[in-house]
């Protein structure tokens, strides 16, 4: 099953997490609390700097988000790894949206730079993913650059985010 809308709300993202959006055994988002965005506001396969696709997603920030209570007591900040994971989640979603089969796994990245922290006073985080390449074979591999902005200021820059979809019948499986 292929779902090619240009935007997705929170209920759609939860359906993806349950394996209902792209079909059982295919690309899924994690369910809360690890789902790191509330909506995908734009997704297409022709936009972005490289003309290969772009994804925009948003997270509404409030002081009650689960990670602020434990990271760190008295100095709450969103863990940087969660923002990075959100970018990997979006690349995997793009692969499923593009018709790729099999469950997804983050495979690495080339470079990551942090220049700010998401604290409870932030109102909105916006993720922008610029797809650079999609390789389609038994393994679907997506390579993209991404940014995470908080209230309009870019805090994270990632280069060469890599995510693969591994068909169940493929000979190559990710190391666990």
UniProtKB/Swiss-Prot annotation:
Necessary for the introduction of cis unsaturation into fatty acids. Catalyzes the dehydration of (3R)-3-hydroxydecanoyl-ACP to E-(2)-decenoyl-ACP and then its isomerization to Z-(3)-decenoyl-ACP. Can catalyze the dehydratase reaction for beta-hydroxyacyl-ACPs with saturated chain lengths up to 16:0, being most active on intermediate chain length. The gene is fabA. Belongs to the thioester dehydratase family. FabA subfamily. Keywords: Cytoplasm, Fatty acid biosynthesis, Fatty acid metabolism, Isomerase, Lipid biosynthesis, Lipid metabolism, Lyase. GO terms for cellular component: cytoplasm. It comes from Rhodopseudomonas palustris (strain HaA2). It is found in: Cytoplasm. GO terms for molecular function: (3R)-hydroxyacyl-[acyl-carrier-protein] dehydratase activity; trans-2-decenoyl-acyl-carrier-protein isomerase activity. This is 3-hydroxydecanoyl-[acyl-carrier-protein] dehydratase. The active site is at residue 71.
